[in-house]
Amino acid sequence: GQAKLWRQKNSTVFAVLLIAITLNFIVTPTYAKNTELEGENYAPSSSSFQKPANVHTKNDTDTVGYFLGGGIQNSFNKESYPAFSGDQPLYTPYRSGFRFLGWYSDAALHKQIKTIPTDRKDHYILYAKWTAKINNYYNVEYYNYHKRESRFDKNLVLLKDLDYSFYNEIDIPGMPDTREEDVLKKYIFSASQCPQGICLTDEFVLITSYSTEDDCMGELMVFDRETGEYMVTLGMDENSHLGGIAFDGDNVWVCNSYENCVERISYDFIELMAYQNTGDVVDARDVVDEFPVKNTPSCITWYGGRLWIATHTLLVNSRMVAYYLDKKTDKLIALSDYKIPQKVQGVTFDDSGNVYLSTSYGRNQSSYLYCYDSVTALATRPKHPRKKVEMPPASEELDVSDNTLYILFESAGEKYYEGTDGKGKSLFPLDKILKIPIRELDVNGSSTSGT
């Protein structure tokens, strides 16, 4: 009798459990639906549920945490953004005595992030990367010059012993201090810039630069000469090194070593873009005329009605060829060929015919400025300049204007400053245009005036 009673009780319990389980499968989904629980909220904490794309509530947000590393936050950087509101830009914070190098998504500062994606609900932790600001005067004064060599070479002087200065009015886009903002403002096409060429006109300072990123246009950047204000960027051939730039009074000439040619751009066009498209980036690749040349165009200058185009070599003497523009055929005619020192990066003349060469190779090897009395003196004794100036590494092109020599450096470009190519970092970078009065060089014993 007890066994029968036990079986009846257990049958009753089993029936109740069966009814409860059945109701759980029927009632619970209905309850969830009626209370408008979304799948993400309804799923247990151990669930791997992922919300389908573009399915979200009006309260969904992407949250962001910032590690500023001693800096002060930019008020435009928010701690939350509405989900699915598009990529949100990141802005530059401030830290006294330091330059901001970007936001990173990992504490090791390897994975840079330039925008916050909001295509799904997420939480981001970002880390600010900093580096000490470049002190140009310090890097000139405390560079490790070859002092022993200067004692034995009476024609060699050190830059720190000259009355030099910097063109502080111009902030070159792509330099560490402004790199991130320059990209946001679209002054440049990428943050990976290598400044190459410089040319001065009455109205403007023109600077060329290439990007180390693939398929990214190079730049011809235009600045107001008096104020240093950035005016406009002209997009150039993405494959070109853009090693040099020159002005002949009517046109601007730019080196294109990739095509083994020089490109001509009307100065009127540059002037028009600078004043009517101020602050813009203009693709100028279709408005240039190409002129093939017989030597690889590494750098260029205009003097005496001729284009002087030099080729960079590493171990043997370089060469420089003078070209004449035949206006009837609109072709460049090679006239004279000259031997010049290796490692040439820039060439220019002053009004008296004195020649100045910028030579360099390597981010931690000295640059040298060579000064000659004439092109004949250069051609006959290329390794024996009248005066030689040792400078910090990575000098590029140079130009003469108003009794002053202007020299551009690439050592603060991302590839060298950050060592992104794996070949080390530049230890004494310069991010401003160097200025040396012609009288300091005293090539032929008298002050001269350049253009």
Region locations from a protein language model:
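Secondary-structure capping and domain/repeat boundary segments
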Residues: 35-135
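Sequence/structural signature of beta-propeller modules
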Residues: 134-185, 429-451
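Beta-strand-rich domains and repeat architectures in extracellular enzymes and scaffolds
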Residues: 182-215
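Surface loop/turn motifs at the tips and blade-to-blade linkers of beta-strand repeat domains
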Residues: 186-191, 234-238, 288-293, 336-341, ...
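Repeated scaffold domains used in trafficking and secretory/extracellular systems
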Residues: 192-197, 239-246, 292-302, 341-348, ...
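Structural motif
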Residues: 215-220, 260-268, 316-324, 364-373, ...
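Loop/turn-rich, solvent-exposed surfaces of beta-rich toroidal or solenoidal domains
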Residues: 338-377
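Conserved blade-ending motifs and adjacent loop-strand segments that build the rim/top face
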Residues: 379-401
